[in-house]
Amino acid sequence: MRIFLDTANIEEIKKGLKLGVVSGVTTNPTLVAKEGISDYKSVVQQICALLPEGDVSAEITAEDPAEMLKQAREIAKWAPNVVVKIPATAEGLEIISKLSKEGVRFNMTLCFSVNQALLGALAGAAFVSPFVGRLDDAGHDGMMLINDIVSIYKEYGFETQVIAASIRHPLHCTQAAQTGAGIATVPYKVLMQMMQHPLTDSGIARFMADWKSVQK
């Protein structure tokens, strides 16, 4: 399993990379706006430079099909390791099918059903991103969707990789790994929480107290 960071914050990415466990980044218009960034291309290229061997997803912002196609072509030129994020819509599928044949890699995002994931794989998407947290918020079982997609992809030999997205807490990461998702994209806060455990903290405190007691 691989871990991606779901952020457009350069400092968070640098900190995450120092841990040696992050191999990709996903961004979207909301994350970029959160950072007050107006030059999307520049920040994506910065991120791509930080992870020359990693996958960096950058999302289109257009809704008109012709403009979506234009943006997808443009984003694909930003860096060798950029992946174009495109919504799971009929228009998105058409663009994935067309440009994947030209070597453009796509991350089909906002996936909320097995059928969407199936069609994305058939169209040639390199990645598909089921949104676990948002499904949970709506009263559905987000992890069951991940499990079903992984099972179907395995059954039919699809090479499309599953990115468990909309991760809200460390348990989501555990569950994603258990279901066989190849990737989980997580906020920096969740990444750090994954390494935390109260027994680790208390164990360190006990060891240090014992060591100091024999140094007197």
Curated annotation (Swiss-Prot):
Known pathway: Carbohydrate degradation; pentose phosphate pathway; D-glyceraldehyde 3-phosphate and beta-D-fructose 6-phosphate from D-ribose 5-phosphate and D-xylulose 5-phosphate (non-oxidative stage): step 2/3
GO biological process: carbohydrate metabolic process; pentose-phosphate shunt
Active site residues according to the UniProt entry: K85
Catalytic activity: D-sedoheptulose 7-phosphate + D-glyceraldehyde 3-phosphate = D-erythrose 4-phosphate + beta-D-fructose 6-phosphate
Gene that encodes the chain: tal
Annotated source species: Dehalococcoides mccartyi (strain ATCC BAA-2266 / KCTC 15142 / 195)
Family according to the record: Belongs to the transaldolase family. Type 3B subfamily.
NCBIfam families referenced in this protein's UniProt entry, alphabetically: fsa_talC_mipB
EC number of this enzyme: 2.2.1.2
Protein role: Transaldolase is important for the balance of metabolites in the pentose-phosphate pathway.
Keywords: Cytoplasm, Pentose shunt, Schiff base, Transferase
Listed name of the protein: Probable transaldolase
PANTHER family found in the cross-reference section: FRUCTOSE-6-PHOSPHATE ALDOLASE 1-RELATED (PTHR10683:SF40), TRANSALDOLASE (PTHR10683)
GO cellular component: cytoplasm
